[in-house]
């Protein structure tokens, strides 16, 4: 199953975690939260989606650009709180098998005074997974969602003895609990969002793992 996910989604980070003998958590996520290599810190803003066949419309859609810019602003706010000076690449398109996203790569230089785990903690969840401003959005989520998100959208990755690390958001996932199977995916909702379009987007996102499990 993991081999198939890797083959079908080579631009995603594929993960699998056995929680116990009857519970498993797996997925294929394109969303890099943070990667530290020596003094370089990279994080990606990934927000704004269309079916892959309509990918060329992404950078000309004002609603999608607005959605993406909100996520960029949230990340910049977090990095600025550590007195970092983030540099933004130009908006680009990340093309996956059945869906495409706008991606902006953001790089910063850090030093030994910066604990990357503190930066990671500030970055999660990004505005794509919570909202903006984050503190107010999380309060609203707590008040209206009547279920726990569990491990969905949490950080998954690695860190070494030199504090180099790489973490992704655990999105587009499946949770297996005995004889029950749960799929997790989401979409960014802003003022001009249309419910049916957002639902269709979620369906496309979870299709990545759903189809492989059903094979």
Where are these regions (language model features)?
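An anion-binding catalytic pocket shared by soluble metabolic enzymes
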Residues: 1-66, 70, 163-186
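A glycine-rich phosphate-binding loop feature that marks nucleotide/adenosyl-phosphate handling sites
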Residues: 18-25, 75-76, 91-98, 155-159
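Contiguous alpha-helical scaffold segments within structured protein domains
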Residues: 42-143, 211-214
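Conserved hydrophobic core element of enzyme catalytic domains
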Residues: 105-215
